[in-house]
């Protein structure tokens, strides 16, 4: 495709900006100089965060050589963040894996052996032997999978089918457990359905933005650019930012609030009290569309049952609640006075009042945004519920320019982990394994015997680590994630299980990550546009892309790996006789035939692909695998408020926001005139609940699982930086991004550094009760912690900060709190 004049000018502008910054943009600038005809362009969503920016990918001679923002993409409108401009280089690191590697000694597998190249058949041989042995000796609960919010939609769907229907094990969980699980449970408790009701179009219509534990300037920079434009172009627009430390988003804030860790719960209840005391309740909305419930308290911290905190909890893991009156709710929040809140949070009273006034003002359209500050929290579900309370009390929800919005961090945490249902307790379209009706729906659609899908919830992410350590989980396959670096409490709860000789660990990844190097078998994986894919972003937008280049060497997509491995198992080897007796026609068939090469999935011929269109999996199998899997999966949500468009529509569009009914996407759910599931005259209907009403929960402040004391005297918070994404397995292989932020540092208040005889640039040992790492003191820069708190990013494999973190989780969502543990510092 030729570059248009608009694209030419945009490319040169990008090149000029990059030159000014001392960077070299891969492709776009070079594409406009003498090679316009040679480069082929096609659309794709960005490989990084959950914003879902659209990019144009330029390929030449079988390689991705260029990338630019897609001017027709409604999310980013042609703009990329710094990571997006370097997308081509993530695929071509010098250490890209191109063949399977098995730990071997003397020509055979050995847990202590060296990684040795083998063939795919040899890799599947050893995997088959390990899986079959575990299934025969200990049953389905002895095998597990850890997947990803970076899986494509059909990869997650194929994995879920293989484990839940094929192997009859619900021990499959995504890394989204570490980032979005609290948001999921929060949505389900309050609304009965997952995912936001609003969309990014709210930004241009809002009067106020409140960020709760979200550094959008670095983590969602394209959305932040839209918020910045809205704020700077309208003097009446207000931005409030709440965090436990000062970061780049504070630069735009009219009200920048730094609070004591965990005390966001106090602030949320104070605002609810303020709304009530100032008669700011939207009485019409509240009386028609809201119920009130009091939640169980003292629910523990998701630690091992033997931990003292779990033994002391009165209602460990309880999500119980009971109806309550408005007067009781009013009395409950009345305890959270301005004075008490200021004392508990350390926030000045005037700042608290300014914040509360935004929500209480009936003429202010308010959007609440949050990410990991809320979700990675031992009371993360409660925090989600409590922010919904503010919008439900005021009726500021499901309308243009106002509403609560949970931002996601991975490109398909919504589309794959949540919507497909790759969590240990979920099935497609918000269905769950504990519901017999839901299991029956899936079993009938998949044409498998009734009773195949287990009713017992499988092991969640942290429980998988513990089960590996305890020898209960023995074969473990991780895909598209680097949990040995990203997960909590590496020393005590993860590494022991991975290196236990009783266990066999498989890692599928494009690069030799910390996880891969700790495994027994490494499978080289195709990435991004080396396969056909689909992601679902934070605003319910499903986006497709075509395969545009082939993977290097013998690297294969996660989808190929799952489907081909399923050929190794016949139904008699994985299902008991009582199940086979219900469907005798399935005897002797492989799981490939039962799950993937079915009449339902294989009915779309490969001839639907253009003659020159790459699609390695479908051309090898002889049918359009991705289309078949997607259409089967989409069936579950159609007619139930999760409607997805037909497969072919997505290749033509720049994404569509579900529910898509009669060809029309939905911008705002639950409100009349916007949502096709809300009838005329209903006004609002939260149809995830049987009575159509959302729930306001009374939930108190409860302390963190671990706080500073005399010995471990500092809070530690962990997170990300703009230049790197998660564990840096892709971005650190981009030279320009690596040079921009080459190693992790410990951000610390200058007075805390001085008190410990530390200076900027000094090496420092950071020590918790679980481990220690060496880092570099940073008293300046983008992050400015208050006294008593230090901040450290987790992208650096040489500084595994998660050796320090505690594996405490929200007891309801099972999501880890990476934001709060206690450490001490020692000068090196």
From Swiss-Prot:
<dbReference type="GO" id="GO:0042128">
    <property type="term" value="P:nitrate assimilation"/>
</dbReference>
<dbReference type="InterPro" id="IPR006657">
    <property type="entry name" value="MoPterin_dinucl-bd_dom"/>
</dbReference>
<keyword id="KW-0813">Transport</keyword>
<dbReference type="InterPro" id="IPR006311">
    <property type="entry name" value="TAT_signal"/>
</dbReference>
<feature type="binding site">
    <location>
        <position position="372"/>
    </location>
    <ligand>
        <name>Mo-bis(molybdopterin guanine dinucleotide)</name>
    </ligand>
</feature>
<dbReference type="Pfam" id="PF04879">
    <property type="entry name" value="Molybdop_Fe4S4"/>
</dbReference>
<dbReference type="GO" id="GO:0009055">
    <property type="term" value="F:electron transfer activity"/>
</dbReference>
<feature type="binding site">
    <location>
        <begin position="718"/>
        <end position="727"/>
    </location>
    <ligand>
        <name>Mo-bis(molybdopterin guanine dinucleotide)</name>
    </ligand>
</feature>
<feature type="binding site">
    <location>
        <position position="482"/>
    </location>
    <ligand>
        <name>Mo-bis(molybdopterin guanine dinucleotide)</name>
    </ligand>
</feature>
<dbReference type="GO" id="GO:0005506">
    <property type="term" value="F:iron ion binding"/>
</dbReference>
<dbReference type="GO" id="GO:0016020">
    <property type="term" value="C:membrane"/>
</dbReference>
<dbReference type="GO" id="GO:0043546">
    <property type="term" value="F:molybdopterin cofactor binding"/>
</dbReference>
<feature type="binding site">
    <location>
        <position position="794"/>
    </location>
    <ligand>
        <name>substrate</name>
    </ligand>
</feature>
<feature type="binding site">
    <location>
        <begin position="508"/>
        <end position="509"/>
    </location>
    <ligand>
        <name>Mo-bis(molybdopterin guanine dinucleotide)</name>
    </ligand>
</feature>
<dbReference type="InterPro" id="IPR009010">
    <property type="entry name" value="Asp_de-COase-like_dom_sf"/>
</dbReference>
<feature type="domain" description="4Fe-4S Mo/W bis-MGD-type">
    <location>
        <begin position="39"/>
        <end position="95"/>
    </location>
</feature>
<feature type="binding site">
    <location>
        <position position="49"/>
    </location>
    <ligand>
        <name>[4Fe-4S] cluster</name>
    </ligand>
</feature>
<feature type="binding site">
    <location>
        <begin position="212"/>
        <end position="219"/>
    </location>
    <ligand>
        <name>Mo-bis(molybdopterin guanine dinucleotide)</name>
    </ligand>
</feature>
<keyword id="KW-0732">Signal</keyword>
<keyword id="KW-0411">Iron-sulfur</keyword>
<feature type="binding site">
    <location>
        <position position="175"/>
    </location>
    <ligand>
        <name>Mo-bis(molybdopterin guanine dinucleotide)</name>
    </ligand>
</feature>
<keyword id="KW-0574">Periplasm</keyword>
<dbReference type="InterPro" id="IPR041957">
    <property type="entry name" value="CT_Nitrate-R-NapA-like"/>
</dbReference>
<feature type="binding site">
    <location>
        <position position="376"/>
    </location>
    <ligand>
        <name>Mo-bis(molybdopterin guanine dinucleotide)</name>
    </ligand>
</feature>
<dbReference type="GO" id="GO:0030151">
    <property type="term" value="F:molybdenum ion binding"/>
</dbReference>
<keyword id="KW-0479">Metal-binding</keyword>
<feature type="binding site">
    <location>
        <position position="83"/>
    </location>
    <ligand>
        <name>Mo-bis(molybdopterin guanine dinucleotide)</name>
    </ligand>
</feature>
<dbReference type="Pfam" id="PF00384">
    <property type="entry name" value="Molybdopterin"/>
</dbReference>
<keyword id="KW-0560">Oxidoreductase</keyword>
<dbReference type="GO" id="GO:0006777">
    <property type="term" value="P:Mo-molybdopterin cofactor biosynthetic process"/>
</dbReference>
<keyword id="KW-0534">Nitrate assimilation</keyword>
<feature type="binding site">
    <location>
        <position position="802"/>
    </location>
    <ligand>
        <name>Mo-bis(molybdopterin guanine dinucleotide)</name>
    </ligand>
</feature>
<dbReference type="GO" id="GO:0051539">
    <property type="term" value="F:4 iron, 4 sulfur cluster binding"/>
</dbReference>
<comment type="subunit">
    <text>Component of the periplasmic nitrate reductase NapAB complex composed of NapA and NapB.</text>
</comment>
<dbReference type="InterPro" id="IPR019546">
    <property type="entry name" value="TAT_signal_bac_arc"/>
</dbReference>
<comment type="similarity">
    <text>Belongs to the prokaryotic molybdopterin-containing oxidoreductase family. NasA/NapA/NarB subfamily.</text>
</comment>
<keyword id="KW-0004">4Fe-4S</keyword>
<dbReference type="GO" id="GO:0050140">
    <property type="term" value="F:nitrate reductase (cytochrome) activity"/>
</dbReference>
<keyword id="KW-0408">Iron</keyword>
<feature type="binding site">
    <location>
        <position position="150"/>
    </location>
    <ligand>
        <name>Mo-bis(molybdopterin guanine dinucleotide)</name>
    </ligand>
</feature>
<keyword id="KW-0500">Molybdenum</keyword>
<feature type="binding site">
    <location>
        <position position="819"/>
    </location>
    <ligand>
        <name>Mo-bis(molybdopterin guanine dinucleotide)</name>
    </ligand>
</feature>
């Amino acid at each position: 495709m030729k570059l248009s004049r608009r694209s030419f000018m945009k490319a040169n502008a990008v090149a000029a900006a990059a030159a000014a910054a001392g960077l070299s943009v891969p492709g776009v600038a070079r594409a406009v100089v003498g090679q316009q005809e040679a480069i082929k362009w096609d659309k794709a969503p960005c490989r990084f965060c959950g914003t879902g920016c659209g990019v144009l990918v330029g390929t030449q001679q079988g390689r991705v050589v260029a990338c630019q923002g897609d001017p027709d993409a409604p999310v980013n409108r042609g703009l990329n963040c710094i990571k997006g401009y370097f997308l081509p280089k993530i695929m071509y690191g010098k250490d890209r894996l191109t063949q399977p590697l098995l730990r071997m000694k003397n020509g055979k597998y050995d847990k202590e052996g060296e990684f040795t190249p083998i063939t795919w058949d040899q890799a599947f041989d050893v995997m088959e032997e390990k899986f079959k042995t575990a299934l025969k000796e200990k049953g389905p609960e002895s095998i597990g999978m850890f997947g990803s919010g970076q899986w494509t939609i059909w990869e997650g769907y194929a994995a879920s089918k293989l484990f839940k229907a094929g192997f009859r094990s619900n021990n499959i969980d995504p890394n989204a457990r570490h980032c979005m699980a609290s948001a999921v449970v929060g949505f389900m408790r309050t609304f009965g359905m997952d995912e936001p009701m609003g969309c990014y179009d709210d930004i241009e219509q809002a009067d106020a933005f409140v960020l709760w534990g979200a550094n959008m300037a670095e983590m969602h920079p394209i959305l932040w650019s839209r918020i910045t434009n809205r704020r700077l172009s309208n003097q009446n627009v207000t931005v409030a930012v709440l965090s436990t430390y000062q970061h780049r988003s504070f630069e735009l804030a009219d009200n920048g609030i730094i609070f004591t860790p965990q005390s966001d719960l106090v602030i949320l209840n104070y605002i609810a009290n303020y709304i009530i005391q100032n008669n700011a309740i939207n009485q019409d909305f509240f009386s028609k569309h809201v119920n009130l419930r009091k939640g169980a308290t003292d629910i523990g911290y998701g630690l091992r049952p033997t931990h003292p905190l779990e033994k002391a909890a009165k209602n460990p893991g309880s999500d119980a609640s009971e109806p309550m009156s408005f007067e009781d709710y009013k009395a409950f929040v009345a305890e959270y006075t301005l004075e008490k809140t200021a004392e508990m949070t350390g926030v000045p009273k005037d700042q608290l009042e300014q914040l509360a006034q935004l929500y209480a003002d009936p003429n202010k359209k308010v959007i609440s945004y949050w990410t990991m500050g809320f979700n990675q929290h031992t009371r993360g579900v409660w925090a989600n519920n409590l922010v919904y309370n503010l919008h439900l009390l005021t009726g500021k929800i499901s309308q243009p320019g106002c509403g609560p919005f949970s931002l996601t961090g991975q490109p398909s945490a919504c589309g794959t982990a949540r919507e497909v249902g790759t969590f240990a307790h979920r099935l497609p379209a918000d269905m769950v394994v504990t519901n017999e009706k839901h299991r029956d729906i899936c079993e009938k659609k998949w044409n498998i015997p009734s009773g195949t899908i287990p009713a017992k919830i499988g092991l969640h992410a942290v429980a998988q680590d513990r089960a590996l350590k305890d020898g209960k989980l023995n074969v473990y396959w991780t895909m598209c994630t680097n949990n040995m670096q990203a997960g909590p409490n590496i020393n005590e709860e993860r590494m022991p299980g991975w290196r236990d000789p009783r266990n066999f660990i498989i890692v599928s990844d494009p690069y030799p990550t910390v996880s891969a190097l700790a495994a027994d078998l490494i499978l080289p994986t195709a990435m991004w546009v080396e396969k056909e894919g689909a992601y679902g972003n934070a605003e319910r937008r499903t986006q497709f892309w075509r395969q545009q280049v082939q993977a290097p060497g013998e690297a294969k997509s996660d989808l190929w790996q799952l489907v081909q491995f399923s050929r190794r198992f016949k139904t008699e080897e994985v299902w008991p006789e009582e199940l086979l007796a219900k469907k005798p026609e399935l005897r002797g068939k492989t799981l490939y035939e039962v799950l993937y090469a079915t009449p339902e999935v294989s009915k779309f011929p490969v001839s639907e692909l253009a003659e020159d269109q790459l699609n390695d999996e479908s051309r090898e199998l002889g049918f359009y695998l991705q289309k078949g899997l997607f259409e089967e999966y989409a069936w579950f949500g159609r007619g139930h408020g999760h409607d997805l468009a037909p497969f072919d529509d997505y290749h033509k569009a720049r994404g569509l926001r579900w529910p898509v009914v009669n060809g029309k996407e939905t911008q705002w759910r639950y409100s009349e005139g916007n949502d096709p599931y809300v009838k005329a005259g209903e006004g609002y209907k939260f149809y995830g609940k049987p009575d159509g009403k959302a729930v306001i929960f009374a939930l108190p402040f409860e302390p963190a699982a671990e706080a500073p004391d005399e010995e471990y005297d500092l809070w530690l918070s962990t997170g990300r930086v703009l230049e790197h994404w998660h564990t840096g397995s892709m971005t650190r292989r981009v030279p320009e991004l690596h040079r921009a932020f080459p190693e992790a540092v410990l951000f610390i208040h200058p007075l805390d550094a001085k008190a410990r005889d530390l200076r900027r640039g000094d090496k420092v040992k950071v020590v918790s009760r679980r481990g220690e790492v060496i880092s570099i003191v940073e008293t300046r820069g983008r992050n400015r912690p208050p006294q008593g708190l230090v901040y450290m990013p987790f992208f650096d494999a040489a500084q595994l900060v998660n050796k320090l973190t505690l594996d405490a989780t929200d007891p309801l969502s099972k999501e880890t709190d990476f934001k709060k543990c206690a450490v001490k510092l020692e000068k090196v």
